[in-house]
Design a protein with these regions (language model features):
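Repeated scaffold domains used in trafficking and secretory/extracellular systems
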Residues: 26-37, 65-74, 109-117, 160-174, ...
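Structural motif
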Residues: 8-11, 47-51, 87-92, 133-145, ...
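Short loop/turn segments that connect beta-strands within beta-propeller blades
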Residues: 14-16, 53-56, 93-98, 146-149, ...
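Intrinsically disordered, low-complexity segments enriched in Gly and acidic/Ser/Thr residues
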Residues: 190-285
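Hydrophobic beta-strand positions that form the internal "hydrophobic ladder"
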Residues: 2, 39, 78-79, 122-125, ...
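A short beta-strand motif characteristic of beta-propeller blades
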Residues: 16-24, 56-62, 99-106, 152-162, ...
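Acidic, serine/threonine- and glycine-rich low-complexity intrinsically disordered segments
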Residues: 104-106, 110-226, 232
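Non-cytosolic head/periplasmic domains of membrane-anchored proteins
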Residues: 19-128
Length: 315
């Protein structure tokens, strides 16, 4: 299935376009997070967040402070970063919307949180904080543990890693024990069962334009404008091994994994590429397309535009 949302509400559809449920709300700036069968939508800079599963709404959290970011786990727990002027709070909410944890961070001590990610099992969280030290910009990547292990640690912090002169703008748990941090010129792969360890460091020479993930792969679209095709696509596995390095010229708007393939799409076309860089499909659309979604079935995709939903099957 897939989700559609706006300032007025959110709906969940089967892949054939049938509405399963819809929920109305009023938000100025809604943002959605999805993990497995769980969905969260929050009003960024507002104070409300809803959690859903494929059957409908399961909870609502009302915060006393503006929401900066929302994340949801596979079991429906929500993590929200809240703004309190000179401090921030990372709150965890149960599926029913009740607050179960709260971690306070300060701008003067920890820095400003630019990205967070919760593990699918909701037991761990990675956050990236940016701070200025003299003339230098520094990023700290911090791990929190919300299981029994974290109870004995200050603010549940179980590890931290420093990046000098690098902004780490993207952090992501790709499964329960692996997390990735992407900086301007570096990709770090961390392993965390209870405490984190840095497993692999990958240096990136070109400017990173887009990062995308699956539970097996890390994909980067890089600027390649100085040599041939305008873009370079590189893919790494969780062991830090490069499994794809190719260039392309498609003016993509969306890029994502579908198993061991990569989908690149824009309003008028859709390209499917395997991990050898071979194009398996190149399809043009008559009407502008909003998105192309994998269905979980090999070679079957849902095409969404403003007027209809269509299922396509590749030969």
């Amino acid at each position: 299935g897939y989700v559609r949302y706006s300032n007025d509400g959110i709906s969940y559809y089967k892949s054939n376009g049938k509405v399963i449920w819809n929920q109305t709300y009023s938000m100025q700036n809604p943002k959605v997070s999805i993990c497995g069968n769980s969905i969260a939508v929050a009003d960024i800079n507002g104070s409300s967040a809803y959690s859903f599963n494929t059957s409908g709404q399961v909870g609502k959290a009302d915060t006393s402070m503006p929401i900066l970011q929302i994340e949801v786990s596979d079991n429906g727990k929500m993590a929200a970063v809240l703004d309190d002027n000179n401090a921030n709070y990372i709150n965890m909410y149960d599926t029913n919307g009740e607050k179960i944890y709260s971690v306070k961070t300060t701008l003067s001590g920890d820095g400003y949180p630019i990205d967070v990610s919760i593990s699918p099992d909701a037991k761990k969280l990675i956050a990236s904080f940016i701070r200025v030290s003299g003339d230098e910009i520094k990023t700290d990547v911090v791990f929190y543990n919300f299981s029994d292990v974290g109870k004995n640690e200050t603010e549940r912090v179980v590890g931290g890693f420093n990046y000098d002169d690098v902004i780490v703008g993207d952090v992501k748990f790709i499964n329960d024990t692996m997390a990735v941090a992407v900086g301007e010129n570096v990709v770090s792969i961390y392993k965390i069962k209870e405490y984190p360890s840095l497993e692999h460091t990958i240096k990136i020479d070109n400017e990173i334009e887009r990062v995308f993930y699956s539970d097996q792969y890390i994909g980067l679209v890089l600027d390649n404008s100085e040599s041939g095709d305008p873009y370079k696509l590189v893919v790494y596995n969780t062991s830090g091994k490069q499994v794809l390095d190719t260039t392309f010229s498609i003016q993509y708007t969306n890029v994502q994994f579908d198993g061991k393939s990569v989908i690149m799409s824009n309003a008028s076309s859709f390209v499917l590429m395997n991990m050898r860089g071979k194009q398996l499909a190149d399809i043009s659309f008559d009407m502008p397309v909003i998105d192309v979604l994998p269905t979980g079935s090999r070679g079957v995709y849902t095409v969404v535009n403003s007027k209809y939903i269509q299922s396509i099957k590749l030969k």
